[in-house]
Amino acid sequence: MAREEGEQQESMAEWLIDVLGEPSAVRNPLVHEPRRTRELSDLLLSYEYGCFLLESKTLGIFDRIDIPDRSALRKGVLRHVNKAANQLAGACANIRRGLRITDKAGQDITVNRDWPIHCIILVPELSLIADCDELIPKLALSLLGNSKAFLNLVDLSELHNLVYNAGSIASKSQKLTRLMAFDGILLKRCELASHHKTPDFRFRMTVADDK
């Protein structure tokens, strides 16, 4: 059941990211390290102005005999978020090292390695960690300083809102694609998150119509 829970959340994330248009996201890409080949991230999307890495974390509550209380769920989410941040830091390092990256069939994936990387951690529900006011600034500063990457912590509802926001911005622009708008939205959201008192916030960006 936990595997199904994780697969479902990853599939929803992949579907939402693919709404942004071409190129499509790659599910469970592989990085070929000198000693072994392993998964780079849950999702990878690269385009001409950068790339996005997404790690999806679930709680596996359907495998448990007793439903945990919110305090236990909070601890579980925090543990998974820290694990995801470490995984993303490693993925960023492998991208910067120029290691070969492929899909599961062994086909090479062209990855933009020159621009800062957008790292997304997808959790089941942001409200579970609403009181963790130091979480995002700490993790975001670490990723930015060590990996030249921007971090956004979202749940499916917020990811849906951000994708919809990107489509709305792109529809009012002659120059911006949905992917470009999504890139800009994540950048501004990451900047705002470092000044926010809680990871549980909703973000929407507006721009002037240039048509």
Question: What is each model feature region?
Answer:
Residues M1-L40, L45-K211:
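Intrinsically disordered, low-complexity Ser/Thr/Pro/Gly-rich regulatory segments
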